[in-house]
């Protein structure tokens, strides 16, 4: 999450404070460099000293995601990362996730946006009533397969219906 009344910069450096301090003292030049780098990568324009709550929901989402990148995580676990964001911001988030995965890292994505899953994922696990309804490989992923599995429709049940 974000600390909405705090600045964009404060939110971006919060998870990295331990790495940006030495002997209990904050390294302001390192903090400023990190903020400038992340703001550039996120395409956040304007003053990073303004409150994060002044950003659009999509830009807030980019800050919430990007603040973890300096920690060099091997896994990102995301829940509906593009819900409620505009198309351009969604594209930027997709680019960030693809770049992360291209570095050999794992992105685990829970999403109610079926086209997003088709567009981003190389594997999809569909849950229905708390159980795995389908595990789809890249060549099996389609909106129909995902929705069908979520609704309990399988090849066997389709044959019974015919």
What residues fall within each predicted segment?
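Glycine-rich phosphate-binding loops of nucleotide-dependent enzymes
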Residues: 1-162
């Amino acid at each position: 999450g974000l600390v909405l009344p705090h600045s964009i910069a404060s939110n971006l450096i919060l998870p990295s404070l331990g790495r940006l301090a030495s002997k209990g003292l904050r390294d302001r030049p390192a903090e400023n460099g990190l903020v400038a780098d992340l703001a550039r990568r996120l395409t956040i324009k304007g003053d990073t000293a303004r409150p994060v709550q002044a950003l659009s929901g999509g830009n807030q989402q980019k800050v919430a995601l990007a603040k973890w990148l300096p920690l060099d995580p091997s896994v990102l676990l995301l829940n509906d990362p593009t819900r409620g964001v505009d198309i351009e911001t969604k594209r930027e988030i997709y680019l960030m996730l693809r770049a992360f995965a291209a570095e050999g890292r794992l992105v685990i994505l829970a999403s109610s946006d079926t086209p997003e899953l088709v567009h981003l994922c190389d594997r999809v696990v569909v849950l229905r009533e708390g159980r795995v309804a389908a595990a789809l490989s890249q060549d099996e992923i389609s909106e129909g397969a995902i929705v069908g599995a979520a609704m309990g429709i399988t090849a066997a049940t389709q044959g019974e219906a015919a």
